[in-house]
Amino acid sequence: MGPRSRQRRTGTVQSTNDSSSLSKRSLAAQGYVSDAFAPLLVPGIVRRTPLIHRGYYVRARAVRHCVRAFLDLTGAIRSPTRAQILSLGSGSDSLYFRLKAAGLLTRTAVWEVDFPDVSRLKAKRIEETPELCAQTGPFKIGDSASTLCFESSDYRILGADLRELQRLGEALDSAGLDATSPTLILAEAVLTYLEPSRAAALIAWVAQRFPNALFVIYEQMKPGDAFGQIMLQHFRRLNSPLHGLELFPDVEAQRQRFLQAGWTTCSALDLNEFYRRLIPADERRRVETLEPFDEFEEWHLKCSHYFILAASRGDILSETPVFLPSEASFQIDPALPSGFLSASVVTSDHQHSSLQRYGHTSVLLSPGIIFSAGGFGEQEGRHCRVSRFHLLSRSCDSEWKGCQISTLGTEGQWDGRLYHTMTRLSDTRVLVLGGRLSPVNPASGALQLDIYKSEDNCPEGQNVVVTKAALEEGSMLSCWRHSTTEVYYQNQRYLFVYGGRSVTDPVLSDCRFLHVETMAWVRIPVQGSSPEGRHSHSACSWQGGALIAGGLGASEEPLSSVFFLRPVSSGFLWESIHIQPSITPRYSHTAHVFNGKLLLVGGVWIHSSSVPGVTVISLTTGLSSEYQIDTASVPWPLMLHNHSSALLPEEQQLLLIGGGGNCFSFGTYFNPHTVGLDLSSLGLGQ
């Protein structure tokens, strides 16, 4: 690497460090963690989003867990030498200061290594900040030619390149690091920025150099799915490509990577498992109520694409595992796939007429017309709550075409709600219930949408009239992520509204019935054991009742249960459907009944490293089977959450409409076109 390339590399790393450090500062400012030193080390004030806060919180807790485990282990033994923490690629991290202030460094010292420019800048900030100097005690600042940028009795900062191992070893020796002492080597999002051969050399070098060591890394994984592809694209755009993910795509591959490099033991968890297993429930509840939050899909996907790993060598650090095993396995993998369902793009519409949004709702008005409204998407070159309606239509056997349609007149306007429901009342009329404008602002009232055709019957010429639905007063439905299902009782048509969440309730278990003919809320007796509250579940009409499947429960954990609200003479009866083999808990999916089978399509799950496809459940036997979606013919990442879908039973096809999400800090992604799933393999005999 030449001087210019090295300089560009250092600048990119500095930019990455600055962004991460600002996120950590924002994390502390909002009360997720206690860190009085982050603001002193990181200039500037930025308030990150709740999603970023949660992502950095679980990262901080995972690293904290490993550091505390190391300090507990080394503190319990009598050693003639002090324990050591060696932080690689430490940037502006405040670890030393937090440990020192907590009194946890009485028998431990800290060494940090980063690029020279990064390390010198940190040393200068410490020198200029009295509160930081008070923690370090007397110190020395190295000259510009020295790799040792800062030195105190228990803290040293070095400027060195992790790819130059011989020089790194010499610098650590000169800085007083004792290779024989128990040592924690910490690398937060570091190895992945090294080329695979360089990272392998570093892992082996550390194993050979430190006979009593714990190596902890926090990094990305799972590059192959849609979220992983967006993640890779993001870092490529930053000129900081992620290396080695294809070689080590999951936690088991990462474990074998370290074991084969000379480490005695190694364990690793993705951050969903770490969060649910190793953070106490009361602490999780505290964090989950710090800020209004409604990006569960992206939160869980982020956690499934990062892992924390601890590899150890030597008798001292290998006897006690850092991640104690749990009594019950966290993994709930789906059954082996019974087959594949081919996916293909069914629209060729231009960008201005495509449906690029998520959190919307779609309704099949007639076999050739699908109407969509709401959601967050792209409109007039910016990302926003979408105000325009979308019509997907075709005539005879022609291809599907999409178009944007507008509101007619000035009496009513679409309010831009998300996570609402829409129900077809006729070929030209739709009822909208619930939804939200923001996590603290529910949508106001029910809406009636009337679609008016143009004189030439051209889809582009159609208009929508928005009016307040004439529901009885005092019946405000202030929830979102709920379901609305058509059911029948005493030969009368009702809409069954179930579940969801609100500003005050993280989950709802309410059952409400709207009489369609009179638009009045009515009370109908419901017997049986009620399902636990949930949101982001699916609901389908079947045999006059409703099938409720999956969803996210009160503890923000996906559910696997399937219930049938069965019509009976006295009202309705909740029945639990026994499924074999049991299915992986999921939410944010869609569902349809097809040929006597319940199809659960896409969604998000946290208990398996695979990607949800289509789960098929026989409604007569309860037998389930799994089908993967073959996306080889889809030329872009297909994200199947926050989407909508429409079943075309006569054609044995399912249309997947919209979908995507705000992919952590990697950018917002929208599925650009409508995709069709071929269901012909799920015939009556399957």
UniProtKB/Swiss-Prot annotation:
Keywords: Methyltransferase, S-adenosyl-L-methionine, Transferase, tRNA processing. InterPro entries: Gal_Oxase/kelch_b-propeller, Kelch-typ_b-propeller, Ppm1/Ppm2/Tcmp, SAM-dependent_MTases_sf. Residues 1-22 are annotated as: Disordered. One of its GO terms (molecular function) is tRNA methyltransferase activity. Pathway: tRNA modification; wybutosine-tRNA(Phe) biosynthesis. It catalyses: 7-[(3S)-3-amino-3-carboxypropyl]wyosine(37) in tRNA(Phe) + S-adenosyl-L-methionine = 7-[(3S)-(3-amino-3-methoxycarbonyl)propyl]wyosine(37) in tRNA(Phe) + S-adenosyl-L-homocysteine; 7-[(3S)-(3-amino-3-methoxycarbonyl)propyl]wyosine(37) in tRNA(Phe) + S-adenosyl-L-methionine + CO2 = wybutosine(37) in tRNA(Phe) + S-adenosyl-L-homocysteine + 2 H(+). One of its GO terms (biological process) is wybutosine biosynthetic process. The keyword Acyltransferase does not apply. Residues 10-22 have a biased composition (Polar residues). Its EC number is 2.1.1.290, 2.3.1.231. S-adenosyl-L-methionine binds at R59, G89, D114, D161, L162, E188. It is an enzyme of class 2 (transferase). Pfam families: Kelch_KLHDC2_KLHL20_DRC7 (PF24681), LCM (PF04072). Probable S-adenosyl-L-methionine-dependent methyltransferase that acts as a component of the wybutosine biosynthesis pathway. Wybutosine is a hyper modified guanosine with a tricyclic base found at the 3'-position adjacent to the anticodon of eukaryotic phenylalanine tRNA. May methylate the carboxyl group of leucine residues to form alpha-leucine ester residues. Interacts with RNF144B/IBRDC2. Belongs to the methyltransferase superfamily. LCMT family. This is tRNA wybutosine-synthesizing protein 4. The gene is Lcmt2.
